[in-house]
Regions:
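Short N-proximal segments of mature Sec-exported proteins
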Residues: 21-71
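Cleaved targeting-peptide boundary
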Residues: 12-23
Length: 115
């Protein structure tokens, strides 16, 4: 009976840890996306070429980028511990690329609307 109670407690603690990691990863994503949106909203961005804006986005928000990267990797490692870290890194890189693609898409739409 004691072993069952300990197993349930450990399982509950792991579920809480995974839930907390998911929340932190989501907050990291939101922070990074909001920072990129801030770059899009800067008055100077309206006059940038597509290439210049893409270069700006690639180096923008380094602390938010790093936080999102670390938090998402932590979450994936907890949620899927048997999955190879390389797979998790690919997922993280895809999530970051998607956030950057979203702001680039908005920029391109705005550029198209002003031409």
């Amino acid at each position: 009976m004691l072993a069952l109670a300990l197993a349930l407690t450990a399982s509950s603690a792991l579920a809480d840890e995974v839930g907390d990691a998911h929340k932190l990863a989501s907050q990291g994503r939101d922070s990074y996306s909001n920072c990129l949106a801030g770059e899009y909203s800067r008055p100077e961005a309206k006059g940038m070429s597509v290439q210049d804006f893409a270069a700006d986005i690639a180096i923008a928000c380094p602390s938010e980028w790093q936080n999102f990267r670390v938090r998402l990797l932590d979450y994936l490692s907890l949620q899927f511990p048997s999955t190879d870290t390389g797979v998790h890194l690919t997922t993280v890189n895809h999530a970051i690329a998607t956030a950057e693609k979203d702001v680039m898409t908005a920029f391109l739409r705005r550029k198209g609307a002003t031409n």
